[in-house]
């Protein structure tokens, strides 16, 4: 038994200078797990609650002492003495103790930090790397794959202080044979994009996720700049590198008139018009994945978009599904989208995260493991991507150490599996829905 003997919560600082929750779980035998909760900027309305103190005299109201207090008191009191290797039981104890639908009593930030720290401690007690332990929890021991990175190299929307409406323009180094080669290709395109932007007299400052955040005339101009950078780096767009976008459409959807208002371009679209706008971009550029291409509440619009684009483009639900199996189940039944973005702080525990990934895969949907715009050095999502053989990961650009921490962990994992004589496959474009 991997008996929990101590649980410690603390307030640490994330990549945006805001507090977040870190938890330590100590086991008999001296094994320790340490994990921190991430934080989002553009959030789905049905996400589990991130508990903030609201005390304007501390961190502008963003303190997390209440959540930390829950870790050190109620949660610690309930799980000390329990077996850390029973992840589902530990998570359920915290969920039941919280007693709310959206984890608003203790905060998903408190529950998740303890959930992940518990898994790390249990993995250490078994002498397993975290990805291997996650594969065991997932019911797929020894089944791994290295994920195709979706690298957010131009930031807009809520992730940047610029006039670009679409939140993320991403590259996928699909021509790579390994994760390490994919990162090299991504880095080379990133550095060439800096040169392209500089030559145009555009800003090369970076946004929350490490991508550039220039003011551009249109979303198409962002794609054109990336195309030029790919070619300058010596690669072929559509063969070596494909494109993906996160529209984060809820951020520019006007609920009063039902229009998608792209202020940066000075254009307004109905739901169906916006789908056809995206369809045109897909005809002009090799865009193989679109995230949140409609407002989270516009299920009729999503159904239409899935009908129009779903057989040739991966349509990822982020704000749409919020890593929630109840919502995902309804989406699957109604034929909404064909992929889910997995952010474990949207649901608030590792067990529930694994359930969402399994439900998606069983239904023929893909699962894209994702960071949040507010991150720390915690690299658990790298192990989650490998240990569930998800096939795809979104963890930012080729700058900011909070993003690079995840890529470096993937490098370590890929190398460790190769040295053990059990290399994990890198599926490239085959991992993307509709592209196999």
Curated annotation (Swiss-Prot):
Q: List the PROSITE patterns.
A: ENOLASE
Among Pfam families, the record links this protein to:
Enolase_C, Enolase_N
Residues bound to (2R)-2-phosphoglycerate are 167, 343, 372-373, 394
Cofactors demanded by this protein: Mg(2+)
What EC class is this? lyase
GO BP = glycolytic process
Q: How is the cofactor bound?
A: Binds a second Mg(2+) ion via substrate during catalysis.
InterPro entries from the UniProt entry: Enolase, Enolase-like_C_sf, Enolase-like_N, Enolase_C, Enolase_CS, Enolase_N
Q: At the top level of its lineage, which domain of life is listed?
A: Bacteria
Active site per UniProt = 209 (proton donor), 343 (proton acceptor)
Which compartment or compartments is the protein found in?
Cytoplasm; Secreted; Cell surface
**Transmembrane residue ranges:** none
As its record notes, the protein acts as a catalyst of: (2R)-2-phosphoglycerate = phosphoenolpyruvate + H2O
Tell me which family the UniProt entry assigns to this protein. Answer: Belongs to the enolase family.
In terms of NCBIfam families, this protein maps to: eno
Q: What is this protein called?
A: Enolase
Question: What is the organism of origin for this protein?
Answer: Mannheimia succiniciproducens (strain KCTC 0769BP / MBEL55E)
